[in-house]
């Protein structure tokens, strides 16, 4: 009887701990995804200005004709 009660209490405690761990892991995962998305969009600068998203400068018309 006492052993069964202790077993139930332990399983409830583990269940609550696991639920909290899953929620925390989800929040961390979402934070990392949002950070990665901002970085890919170029919104990760310290001054709040967006970075240029183009890797190369635009090609001028005179260069394209050559």
Curated annotation (Swiss-Prot):
Pfam families: Polyoma_agno. Residues 45-66 are extracellular. GO terms for cellular component: host cell nuclear membrane; host cell plasma membrane; host cell rough endoplasmic reticulum membrane; membrane. The modification Phosphoserine is found at residues 7, 11. Phosphorylated by host PKC. Phosphorylation alters the stability and may also have an impact on the subcellular location. It is found in: Host cytoplasm; Host nucleus membrane; Host rough endoplasmic reticulum membrane; Host cell membrane. Residues 1-27 are cytoplasmic. GO terms for molecular function: channel activity; DNA binding. GO terms for biological process: monoatomic ion transmembrane transport. It is a single-pass type II membrane protein. The keyword Phosphoprotein applies. Keywords: Host cell membrane, Host cytoplasm, Host endoplasmic reticulum, Host membrane, Host nucleus, Host-virus interaction, Ion channel, Ion transport, Membrane, Phosphoprotein, Signal-anchor, Transmembrane, Transmembrane helix, Transport, Viral ion channel. The chain crosses the membrane at residues 28-44. The keyword Translocase does not apply. The modification Phosphothreonine is found at residue 21. Its main location: host cell. Belongs to the polyomavirus agnoprotein family. Homooligomer. Interacts with VP1. Interacts with large T antigen; this interaction may impact upon the activity of T-antigen on the control of viral gene transcription and replication. Interacts with small t antigen. Interacts with host CBX5; this interaction induces the dissociation of CBX5 from LBR, resulting in destabilization of the nuclear envelope. Alters the structure of the nuclear envelope by interacting with host CBX5 and disrupting CBX5 association with LBR. Involved in the perinuclear-nuclear localization of the capsid protein VP1 during virion assembly and maturation. Plays an important role in the release of progeny virions from infected cells and in viral propagation, probably by acting as a viral ionic channel in the host plasma membrane. Allows influx of extracellular calcium ions in the host cell. May contribute to viral genome transcription and translation of viral late proteins. This is Agnoprotein. The lineage of its organism: Viruses, Monodnaviria, Shotokuvirae, Cossaviricota, Papovaviricetes.
